Amino acid sequence: MKKILCMLMPYGGHFYPNLELLRLFVQRGAQVVVYCDAKYQECFPEGDIQVRDYPTAIREYCGHMASAQTDRKRAAREYFSYMADARIYALMQIEDLTMNRMMVEALGAEVADLNPDVFFCDAQASFLAQLREQIDCPQFELNASTFVPALWRSQRFQQYYQEILWTSYPDSISFDQILSLQRKRARRDKRPPDRSFGYLSPLLQDEAERLPATDQMLGFHLELHPQAQRAGVYVSRGTVCESYGAFLLEETVQALAPCGESIHVSWGGNPYSKQVLTQADFPENVHLHAYVNQIKMLENSKVFVTHGGITGVREALFAHTPMVVIPANFPDYQVGQAIEAHHAGILIRNRPLDAEEIREGYVELNRYYEDYQAGAAAMAAELESYWNAYGAELVWKACELA
């Protein structure tokens, strides 16, 4: 019996993509322990998988919310400072090292007692680096997002810096300084994973040719029911709580409101977005929601306006719903590039946001709607094809060989 230990980020967007994989492990007779958020234990009512909480300090670190901002420039500064402000970057590295030490102290002995045959970690869980050095078994990454090439190897990152980061935050450190900091951080990773598995396929992965050979695309599978008769626009920027995204969401809705279509906006439980949206003056065709059934909304909406988060994008592709992508961070910008390149939507590039550019993108989607819908369907078909060819079975084969 294989003993498998998984350590995931404690968010739904990082847990649910791995659900089918975790169930396959159990079906193949593995003993599975998952560190994430214990509330997901309900997904395994028979108790055949243990889902455990991280220490409180780690959960708080992962769930950190940015402070509320009323000034748009200050909100942008806070959002981009993790990458573009050398002082903030240094402070975040210190905090990250503190969390790494805490993980070793809190769970080092527990993990040693588990003595796993195979270890899986979330690709975004930087607080696991020191603990991973103590785990003496094959290690694999599970990537719920898109693969990001080393920034100094990426041609796309320079475009992102010029189009999004610098224009949103002109006080940013230089492009070369950012690359220098990223190289320095990469040298700290003393135990790279043996392989990294992502729920992607080539059409959805920007700069695939710049990824290491150890990055493996698994594809993805969803059972959705795209509706033939569609109407309206669905707008969301996910559930992350920060003010910069709240302002982008409000500006996006203001730009689209004159189109006359019914516009449904989800603020995803983000209190900052709720405050900004409920104080805004929108016409009657704009409908605000804390949460929605996103699958149903995507199946019935004509257009999805998104920040480019991979979970919502995959759902939109399987719903055959074309997208307008308005990214903030680099992975979402990559997703937007892939969506636009394969004719499943349009990427909005100008910052500050240009209402006319957003409206023109929306008009463009509607003018050639069948073509864009076909592009989304083609990307979904490739994801499905890759899942059937590789998918969870490929990961299990890696476990068997470990």
Regions from the PLM with identified roles:
Residues 387-402:
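C-terminal alpha-helical cap of glycosyltransferases
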Residues 15-26, 40:
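Short amphipathic alpha-helix
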Residues 2-3, 30-33, 37-261, 397, ...:
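Nucleotide-sugar-dependent glycosyltransferase catalytic domains
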Residues 52-60, 143-144, 308, 325-329, ...:
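Short beta->alpha connector loops at strand-helix junctions that form conserved
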Residues 6-19, 241-245:
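A short, glycine/small-residue-rich beta-strand->loop->alpha-helix junction that serves as a flexible
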Residues 119, 289-338:
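A donor-sugar binding/catalytic signature common to diverse glycosyltransferases
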Residues 250-287:
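Catalytic donor nucleotide-activated moiety binding site of glycosyltransferases and closely related
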Residues 346, 351, 356-380, 386, ...:
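Conserved donor-nucleotide binding/catalytic region of nucleotide-linked donor-dependent transferases
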